[in-house]
């Protein structure tokens, strides 16, 4: 439920504009994992763990900010948060951040190094909420990097 997944908002610096402040401000405690499996690996490994709560803007604020200039949202419009990165190196939310723009390669369990995704890599995104005695998963979002045509 909304109340069981709600959490305190991660500290925002600078503070949001007044029209984006809400006395009941909260975000959702949704754990997120990014898994990578290369063609050479038998199973995937976790390359990032972050949390939806690290978003600077919660979804209500994103909608308010989007629509304040008259740009309406309509049924069927897609609204997405973008990259969700946390405060630690292990919670960076994109490969660009994880490998720090290609300057800090990551070493995978089989010894391969990656600065960017390569053809044949499979990325799995997982999201879930946990409570006392239960875990609610959102399923897996899986994508494979294909060679350019």
Describe the residue ranges of each PLM region.
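A beta-strand-loop signature enriched in Asp, Gly, Thr, and Trp
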Residues: 11-25, 32-80
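Residue-level preference for beta-strand/loop junctions
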Residues: 2, 26-28
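Short conserved beta-strand and strand-loop elements enriched in small hydrophobics
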Residues: 30-37, 121-127
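Residues that flank catalytic or metal-binding motifs in active/ligand-binding sites
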Residues: 28-30, 139
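Single conserved hydrophobic/aromatic residue that forms the stacking wall/gate
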Residues: 1-6, 10
